[in-house]
């Protein structure tokens, strides 16, 4: 099984589902400057804890800057047994351009 690609519009729709997880893998300063509401900062330092507290069938959307690095992180989570993993195409840059009112600062 592989991760799936998801658009920013599809991500916006999924935000209404309470069990969806948005994991932001950008650097801490970028995350603090602005992120998708409800997203969690995910890094090498906290990934083990992140994986322990999530369900394998829980939808997880990985967000990076432009949608490239998120693909590697999404692949890693699938390799660890997570079944419903997405890489958001366009990354936070596209999200902020399209939905500037939906950026938590």
Swiss-Prot record:
Identification of the protein by name: Thiosulfate sulfurtransferase GlpE
GO molecular function: thiosulfate-cyanide sulfurtransferase activity
Recorded GO CC terms: cytoplasm
Biological processes annotated in GO: glycerol metabolic process
Source organism (scientific name): Pseudoalteromonas translucida (strain TAC 125)
Family of this protein: Belongs to the GlpE family.
Disulfide topology: none
Catalytic activity as recorded in UniProt: thiosulfate + hydrogen cyanide = thiocyanate + sulfite + 2 H(+); thiosulfate + [thioredoxin]-dithiol = [thioredoxin]-disulfide + hydrogen sulfide + sulfite + 2 H(+)
Role according to the record: Transferase that catalyzes the transfer of sulfur from thiosulfate to thiophilic acceptors such as cyanide or dithiols. May function in a CysM-independent thiosulfate assimilation pathway by catalyzing the conversion of thiosulfate to sulfite, which can then be used for L-cysteine biosynthesis.
Subcellular location: Cytoplasm
Active-site annotation: 64 (cysteine persulfide intermediate)
Gene3D superfamilies: Rhodanese-like domain
EC number in record: 2.8.1.1
Higher taxonomy: Bacteria, Pseudomonadati, Pseudomonadota, Gammaproteobacteria, Alteromonadales
Pfam families to which the protein is assigned, alphabetical: Rhodanese (PF00581)
UniProt-listed SMART domains: RHOD
InterPro entries noted in UniProt: GlpE_sulfurtransferase, Rhodanese-like_dom, Rhodanese-like_dom_sf, Thiosulf_sulfurTrfase
Domain Rhodanese: 16-104
């Amino acid at each position: 099984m592989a991760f799936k690609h998801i658009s920013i519009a599809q991500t916006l729709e999924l935000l209404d589902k309470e069990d969806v997880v948005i994991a932001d893998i950008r650097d801490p300063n970028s995350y603090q400057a602005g992120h998708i509401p409800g997203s969690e900062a995910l890094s090498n330092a906290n990934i083990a804890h992140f994986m322990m507290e999530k369900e394998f069938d829980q939808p997880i959307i990985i967000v990076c800057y432009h949608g490239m690095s998120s693909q590697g992180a999404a692949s890693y989570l699938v390799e660890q047994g997570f079944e419903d993993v997405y890489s958001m195409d366009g990354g936070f840059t596209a999200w902020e351009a399209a939905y500037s009112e939906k950026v938590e600062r």
